[in-house]
């Protein structure tokens, strides 16, 4: 099953409470940004330095211009593996943003 990034994020927003989405498609919890969708098929997530470092050893994960705690995720298609990583990383980033990150 192949989803779009929009489908994946919509499902996550149905599941997770307390997510603020800005007009620039930045996702925040209690005012703390934890994810950003700068392009239609690109997702950036604030995972913390250690997790981001490990995440960058997986396919389609790159350094983000936002800093070492962020990962830029750019899969060629949103297949099952990409969907699983996007969902897991979004949840981790959301949890880490609690209380100011």
Named regions from a protein language model:
Residues 1-101:
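Charge-dense, helix-prone N-terminal extensions
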């Amino acid at each position: 099953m192949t989803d779009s990034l929009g489908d994946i994020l919509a499902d996550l927003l149905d599941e997770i409470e307390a997510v603020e989405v800005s007009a620039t498609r930045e996702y925040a919890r209690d005012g703390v940004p934890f994810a950003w969708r700068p392009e239609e098929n690109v997702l950036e997530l604030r995972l913390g330095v250690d997790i981001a470092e490990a995440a960058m050893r997986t396919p389609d994960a790159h350094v983000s211009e936002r800093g070492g705690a962020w990962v830029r995720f750019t899969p060629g298609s949103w297949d099952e593996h990409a969907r699983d990583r996007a969902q897991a990383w979004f949840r981790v980033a959301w949890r880490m943003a609690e209380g100011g990150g």
